[in-house]
């Protein structure tokens, strides 16, 4: 499970021999998990699980979404048996709001602009981004970039605003990915 999960989810994970991950180590944790078992339940963020599995070379067809509100997660027995990763039908409300159209609009306005996104963004957003990384990775990547670069950042607004302030003296322009704002209630 994810580090920001509730204590009861962490306990559930521990009880069944699972492990807790962060966005920076999710791929390594999945590798460890597959060394223990042939199938992984990744929760609660489906997008982080999907992107991490994809980075490992697991085909999207080998990942299914488990909806806890439906009998058998809304899946057939065959889908469950065939899946390598079962993704819990959950997501971060902040990262969920970013859309591919935000990236397309940015690229049309700033062809030399660079897009960096958190792996909790949708698969489509991640695929269209130049870089994908944890919060710390986003900070390091933008700070290490050459001066006078323009960035579209797909993560929490306060982090983006702080980063923009930190690098503006280098001529870097950092902007929030979404045109609408949803503040994260858990950060």
Where in the sequence are the language-model features?
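The feature marks the mature, well-folded catalytic cores of soluble enzymes
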Residues: 1-187
């Amino acid at each position: 499970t994810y580090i920001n999960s509730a204590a009861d989810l962490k306990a559930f994970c521990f009880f069944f021999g699972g492990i807790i991950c962060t966005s920076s180590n999710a791929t390594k944790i999945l590798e460890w998990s597959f060394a223990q078992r042939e199938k992984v339940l990744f929760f609660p963020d489906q997008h982080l699980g999907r992107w991490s599995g994809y980075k490992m070379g697991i085909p999207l067809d080998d990942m299914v979404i488990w909806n806890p509100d439906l009998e058998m997660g809304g899946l057939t027995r065959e889908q469950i048996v065939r899946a390598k990763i079962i993704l819990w039908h959950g997501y971060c409300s902040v990262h969920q709001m970013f859309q591919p159209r935000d990236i397309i609009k940015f690229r049309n306005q700033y062809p030399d602009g660079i897009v960096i996104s958190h792996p909790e963004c949708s698969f489509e957003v991640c695929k269209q981004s130049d870089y994908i990384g944890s919060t710390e990775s986003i900070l390091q990547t933008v700070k290490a970039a050459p001066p006078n670069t323009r960035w579209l950042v797909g993560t929490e607004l306060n982090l983006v605003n702080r980063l923009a302030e930190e690098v503006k003296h280098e001529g870097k322009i950092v902007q929030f990915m979404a045109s609408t704002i949803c503040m994260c209630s858990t950060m």
